[in-house]
Amino acid sequence: MCIIVILLAVVWILWSGEIRTILTIRQVGDNPYLYYMEYKASYDLDEVIAKDIDENAELLDYIVARIGKGLPIKAKSSQVADENGEVQTLNCTSFQARNCKGGFLYGRNYDYFANPTLITVSRPAKGYASIAASDMSHFGYSLDELPTSFKKKLLCLAAIYAPVDGMNEKGLCTSIMAIPHQPSQQNTPKHDVGTSVIMRLWLDRCATVGEALQLLDSLDVRHDASVGSGYHYMVADAAGNCVVVEFDKDDGWKTLTVSKQPEKNYMLVTNHLLSPKYYTTEPDPAVGNPNSRSWWRYATASEYLDAHDGVLSVDQALECLGLVHWDHLDLPNGKVEVTQYGNVYDQKRLTLRIRPWNQYDKYYDFEL
């Protein structure tokens, strides 16, 4: 009995945060592919930065080692390039608009395969609280492999490092959109961070767009070239400041930023570059993804936002996203894309409303 007590004490000492986190994981409502988690374990972004972890497999190995503390846990991401060396999915729509009730709304469609989604609330000891969405296929889950037992929930802990969009307690929001064939490969003496870690850093450490850009300038962002895609990001704060962050493929991947036009109440981004150096109103595979109808989505959502002068209710924000969502989009590589979810963050009231792909006529609400 004494040995058992000692072993239990050791387990609790080593994994108390992880255990307390796993105990919070639950299915949301009657949706078998939507989950919620409150992250209570420690994590060390400074260590990730110091190790220059910038590849997806490298990050997943680091996470698994940190979770397992020597135990043989395995995980594999589904986010890999096809036989042509590219990813033609992860094609999304994001916008910031004024909220008709005051403040700002941040709308987002996440277009990818039909995968389970995890909503994670984090309250780090040093940093801002946040709520974020993650595609669970990025850390080993699928429609056939779900977190239905304690053991199967272990890999949900990886979500803290892998948001695809989110909002923190200061109302700062961020999301990611794919740009095919253009993985940023910034290479200066600065430390490297990967695709999703920069977003976690923004959520944990930044209250404003200005702070987010300052943090960005202190690091090299390197997208995993093995995935076959690059990305740009939208960052928006509670005061209505909004930028799209891009990387200049023809000039050493220098950071480019596009700001919301002062005469507009909204800013919108899909899956083509907005920087004046590359922007075009006609589909061009050199600067975006025609396969996902990026330019059509941009024009369609812009028309709706212009018709409302960029001032929306939450329901209208969801309506706008609904105009450009996919039930079934056939891609040239033979795969089928859907809108995995559409969501709206209220940057003043700190709420999230989400519609998952398999219940797009229904929504779920969360509060930070």
Describe each PLM feature range.
Residues 1-5:
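Hydrophobic H-region at the start of alpha-helical membrane spans
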Residues 200-203, 213-216, 302:
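Non-transmembrane alpha-helical segments in soluble domains
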Residues 214-227, 233:
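Secretory/export targeting leaders with adjacent low-complexity proregions
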Residues 281-318:
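Long, charge-rich alpha-helical interaction segments
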